[in-house]
């Protein structure tokens, strides 16, 4: 398995993975978002490639804050449904942690939906613990 930067040629596979995560987007929208992230140096988008196929996707970014130390946040992590349990997710999270350490950050945080129990079990297995419960509030315009 290879963990590497997401390339434009990977966007069709990334679109499929995001759909598996529950985000039905068209490839043009994923491409536009990827291009915006490329311009943001505090963001990292990686893929896991296995036998020439993209089977995992990670987006992590550095989040500065006034009220707490700056930390890395995993915005998205998804492994192809056919490859879950094979170490792909752990490899991507290890990449996120190495990136955070290299930037001098002291922690990696992530948010996971309350109903995603298999994801909760995965994160606990790799050393993460629940640090709180919150509600997402949004106002669209």
Regions found by a protein language model. Name each.
Residues 124-133:
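Conserved acetyl-CoA-binding loop of GNAT-fold acetyltransferases
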Residues 5-70, 75, 80, 93-95, ...:
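Acetyl-CoA-dependent GNAT
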Residues 79, 85-98, 121, 125:
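Conserved acetyl-CoA-binding loop-helix of GNAT-fold acetyltransferases
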Residues 109-119, 138-140:
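Conserved beta-strand-loop-alpha-helix junction that forms the acyl-donor binding cleft
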Residues 1-3:
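Extreme N-terminal starter segment of soluble prokaryotic enzymes
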Residues 93, 100-112:
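Conserved GNAT acetyl-CoA-binding A-motif
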């Amino acid at each position: 398995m290879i963990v590497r930067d997401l390339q434009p040629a990977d966007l069709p596979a990334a679109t499929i993975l995001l759909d598996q995560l529950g985000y039905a987007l068209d490839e043009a929208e994923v491409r536009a978002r990827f291009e915006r992230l490329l311009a943001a140096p505090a963001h990292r988008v990686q893929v896991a490639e296995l036998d020439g196929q993209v089977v995992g996707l990670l987006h992590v970014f550095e989040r500065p804050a006034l009220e707490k130390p700056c930390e890395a946040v995993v915005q998205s992590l998804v492994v192809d449904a056919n490859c879950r349990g094979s170490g792909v997710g752990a490899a991507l999270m290890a990449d996120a942690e190495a990136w955070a350490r290299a930037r001098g950050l002291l922690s990696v945080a992530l948010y996971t939906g309350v109903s995603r129990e298999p994801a909760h079990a995965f994160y606990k297995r790799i050393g993460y613990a629940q640090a709180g419960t919150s509600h997402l509030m949004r106002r669209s315009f």
